[in-house]
Amino acid sequence: MEIKRLPALSDNYIFLLHDANNNTAAVVDPAVAEPVLNCLDQLGAKLIAIFNTHHHADHVGGNKKLMEQFPDLCVYGSKEDQGRIPGQQVFLEEGDTVEFAGKTGKVYFVPGHTRGHIAYYFPPNENEEIGDLFCGDTIFAGGCGRLFEGTPAQMVESIGKLRNLPDHTRIWCAHEYTLNNLKFAVTVDKDNSDLQIRYQDVIKARKNEEATVPSLLGEEKKTNPFLRWDQPALQMITGMNDPARVFGKIRGMKDNF
């Protein structure tokens, strides 16, 4: 399974999954249709599936046009998003699976950013070392999504599930927010040397107009404050120990950053 990162809108990423064996494709969170259609034209591939993580317009905006072009495709999304995702045909819950390119993806229910958010995890095959997590707006490189419909406690539980995946998991998040996320992170985790190194690397990458997605989960565990609610440095700066309260305090600080 080849993964193509397609920039869209001002800072979105759409991910096109390509099965070279039968020249079919699936797409994760098509904000708009045009980049997907252009990529499919270049590949000569047929789109057979849309995997939506949540209902926000910048994740489902391309669904309708893609369905018009490929009327046989199947649209997957959360059971909790019924009626909110255009063209949705499959309603997924925690523990469900999806199939593509000979791989089985596991569905995680990860409410917080929205009440129905899900993530798709494709573990490595026997001859692979790295798995792939499509997490929408739950985890960002260096950050996490705002809590529009959920609570800090929900988000801690959701991110906690994803945090337990193998360190060598690629995090395919849906936005290029990394530089701003790390600019905030260094203010709350000041003595984190891994974070300082990553911040400087991202500054250089963005100056060169390089993408910073995907990242690796192991790197996020070391440097992303929203995966580090149980670390003394974050507990100290918030003056709290309870995971949801630590997380909520840091999220509030980021919202006002």
Curated annotation (Swiss-Prot):
GO annotation, biological process: methylglyoxal catabolic process to D-lactate via S-lactoyl-glutathione
GO MF annotation: an example: metal ion binding
Zinc recorded as keyword: yes
Catalytic activity: an S-(2-hydroxyacyl)glutathione + H2O = a 2-hydroxy carboxylate + glutathione + H(+)
Keyword Hydrolase included in the entry's annotation: yes
Keywords assigned: Hydrolase, Metal-binding, Zinc
Residues binding Zn(2+) 2, per UniProt: D58, H59, D137, H175
Listed EC numbers: 3.1.2.6
UniProt: Zn(2+) 1 binding residues: H54, H56, H113, D137
Annotated InterPro entries: Clx_II_MBL, Glyoxalase_II_hydrolase, HAGH_C, Hydroxyacylglutathione_Hdrlase, Metallo-B-lactamas, RibonucZ/Hydroxyglut_hydro
Cofactor names: Zn(2+)
Cofactor note (record): Binds 2 Zn(2+) ions per subunit.
Known pathway: Secondary metabolite metabolism; methylglyoxal degradation; (R)-lactate from methylglyoxal: step 2/2
Summary of subunit composition and partner proteins: Monomer.
Function: Thiolesterase that catalyzes the hydrolysis of S-D-lactoyl-glutathione to form glutathione and D-lactic acid.
UniProt similarity note: Belongs to the metallo-beta-lactamase superfamily. Glyoxalase II family.
Entry protein name: Hydroxyacylglutathione hydrolase
